[in-house]
Design a protein with these regions (language model features):
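Active-site mouth of glycoside hydrolases
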Residues: 68-269, 274-280
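Edge beta-strands of extracellular beta-sandwich domains
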Residues: 514-526, 623-641
């Protein structure tokens, strides 16, 4: 086991690395990554031999050497502010659903870090995170079921004590990340909704005392960690009743005071969440005011929010395009605009006030949907690409939420489960990627007799070429319009080579920097119900509707009864949620045979009555399939295809 201790005192940085089990404490020379160029230019190093030793747990350790790194005579608080810290945290990754996972069935034993199905965390996984270009990692931790309540017989007071073995294992993984040079954010995670939300505001209440006890132990246990390690007080704080902001301020102040009073944490970076880590102006401003007034504008305090984009796009309620209008208002507003608005808000409230920000979680909610391709692949990649760009532009740290559906933790190589999305996420840690301004698929119904132009968003890069094709042959490149032009003869040749509907070509477009872009050429026909595979369903179990997608990718579905929209959210929205009220199975590159399933949650909605329901299914190609479902006495059947 090894640990690194870094201390900053009087303009000096002291670095110590401890290697246990071999009888030696080895000292290393190093500089934390937050050092500015000016600091680096002023640094000087000194080494002095030590002829002493220490004993810990009955084992002797020889002190080989000590190191001093001098940045100069000036103190660094302004240079080492939370703004600078956020910049060097940069692009991060969440070790989600591991140490934060917990079984809530108290009749079953706690399974620890594997409670929600992810395998035990390995050092190789942490190394792979670093190798993928991430510079920070968030390691969420749920304390619930990992502590005991100890009652003092004399006073009758109760003290919460975290399990020592649990803490040791948690710290082991934290130290693996530190050893890789990653900035590490630790926190108290699902406790926010498991018990902390029930706090009534009384500082004598069990929730407040428990929260304080947890941070007393955490602050002490991790006090000798280097400044790479930051403390996030509470994940997504929420409260069942009362003034949520007032309660959160009280908990944040309690954690802050405990951390600062614990030796070794005088300049520890403390991360303060907004209520529910939301980013409405009221939430942002309340947190800014708390940091400025209650925490006296401590330069070693950051703010944190989470960003999952607009729900109707993120969770796929029929809006699948990153540049697709969301709400149909007089002024178009799309997910790209939403992201820009988010960063503008954070910048205006936190950054301009000198407060650094970390987006502790970002992603799209349908990433691990029950539906195949619930997120349109190319449009999902555009979201990640722009997220990385905007975070870098604003000097804000951004940490991708991965609950196990991102990096494959059961794969020896720790590859991405969605390789193309992973490529873009990795590329976005350092720069921009290029892509088609439109959809990642060209749909062709009839034999082409004209060229097809694919406009590109280069984002500062240069177009290099298409794998396996020759510029001037199968395609040309219009540099003035930044567009690839697929020649009619080439399109006709691949069209003729395929008898049925499906994928004609997977074109890999490469650029001077960033991830490659895949543009698919698809032969598409008319989607139909596959009568041979139809079967009746029920309200209780749902209805599977077998389809021949005919080379078309599903986009959205609207359901009507007696001329009115029905189904979950139909009172305010026009489409069903893909992965919830409807589940789509179409996992082939050809978009051939598959199914659309109306789930039990659809039939359970009060708006869905017995009788005929019309389904309007829209595909990315623009084609629409209408069919009728008859519901009677709990049984549902497909009746008509138009």
């Amino acid at each position: 086991m090894c640990g690194v201790s870094i201390r900053r005192q009087g303009g000096h940085l002291f670095v110590r690395r401890t290697v246990a089990g071999i009888g030696v404490v080895a000292m290393i020379v190093g500089m934390p990554s937050m050092a500015t160029e000016a600091q680096a230019a002023q640094k000087s190093c000194e080494s002095a031999g030590l002829s002493s030793s220490i004993e810990s747990s009955g084992q002797q350790y020889a002190l080989i050497s000590d190191v001093r790194i001098n940045y100069g005579d000036e103190a660094e608080p302004e240079e080492y502010s939370s703004l600078a810290y956020a910049k060097v945290m940069g692009s991060g990754w969440n070790l989600g659903n591991s140490f934060d996972s917990v079984g809530t069935d108290l009749s079953e034993p706690d399974q620890g870090e594997v409670s929600w199905g992810n395998p035990q965390v390995t050092k190789e996984l942490i190394r792979s995170v670093k190798s993928k270009g991430f510079t920070s990692i968030r390691i969420p931790m749920t304390a619930y079921r990992r502590y005991t309540e100890v009652v003092d017989a004399a006073t009758g007071t109760t003290k919460t004590v975290l399990d020592e073995q649990w803490l040791e294992r948690y710290r082991e993984v934290v130290d693996w990340a530190v050893d890789e040079g990653l900035h590490v954010m630790i926190d108290i995670h699902h406790d926010s909704w498991l018990w902390a939300k029930n706090w009534n505001g009384d500082t004598n209440a069990a929730e407040y005392i428990r929260f304080s006890d947890l941070w007393k132990q955490m602050a002490s246990y991790f006090a000798d960690e280097p400044e790479l390690v930051s403390f996030e007080t509470l994940n997504e704080p929420q409260f069942s009743q009362g003034d949520a902001q007032e309660k959160l301020n009280a908990l944040n102040k309690a954690a802050y005071d405990i951390i600062r009073a614990t030796p070794g944490n005088e300049q520890r970076m403390i991360v303060i969440p907004t209520v529910e880590t939301a980013y409405g102006d009221d939430r942002l401003k309340a947190t800014r005011d708390f940091i400025q007034k209650d925490l006296h504008n401590d330069p070693y305090v950051m703010a944190t929010v989470h960003y999952y984009s607009e729900w109707v796009y993120s969770a796929n309620l029929g809006i699948t395009g990153f540049d697709e209008d969301l709400y149909g208002g007089s002024q178009p507003y799309n997910p790209r605009n939403s992201m820009e608005n988010f960063f503008q808000r954070v910048n205006a409230v936190f950054t301009t006030s000198g407060i650094g920000t970390v987006i502790g979680e970002y992603g799209l909610l349908a990433y691990d949907s029950a539906s195949d391709n619930a997120l349109q692949a190319g449009e999902e990649q555009k979201y990640y690409e722009y997220m990385g760009h905007m975070a870098r532009e604003h000097g804000i740290a951004a940490m991708f939420w991965d609950n196990g559906s991102g990096i494959d933790r059961n794969d020896a190589d720790y590859s991405w489960k969605k390789p193309l999305a992973g490529d873009v996420i990795q590329a976005s840690t350092t720069g921009r990627s290029s892509y088609a301004t439109g959809l990642d698929t060209v749909y062709i119904e009839n034999r082409p007799d004209a060229d097809i132009s694919i406009p590109l968003a280069l984002n500062g890069n240069s177009f290099i070429g298409i794998d396996g094709l020759t510029e001037g042959g199968e395609y040309t490149y219009d540099s003035q319009q930044s567009a690839v032009v697929l020649k009619a003869d080439y399109l006709a040749s691949v069209f003729d080579a395929r008898k049925g509907n499906g994928l004609l070509a997977d074109l890999t477009l490469r650029f001077s920097a960033g991830a490659p872009w895949h543009e698919y050429v698809m032969k598409s026909g008319v989607p139909t119900v596959d009568a041979d595979r139809l079967a009746a369903g029920t309200r209780e179990n749902g209805l599977d509707i077998a389809l021949d997608f005919a080379g078309n990718e599903f986009k959205s579905i609207t359901t009507y009864q007696n001329g009115n929209k029905v189904g979950p959210n139909s009172g305010w929205w026009k489409y069903l949620q893909n992965g919830s009220a409807v589940v789509v199975h179409d996992n082939t590159a050809d978009h051939s045979l598959g199914s659309v399933t109306l789930t039990p949650s659809f039939f359970a909605d009060a708006t869905v009555q017995d009788g005929q329901i019309t389904l309007e299914i829209t595909f990315q190609s623009g084609k629409i399939l209408e069919l009728t479902v008859e519901i009677s006495n709990g049984v549902a059947r497909v009746q008509t295809t138009i």
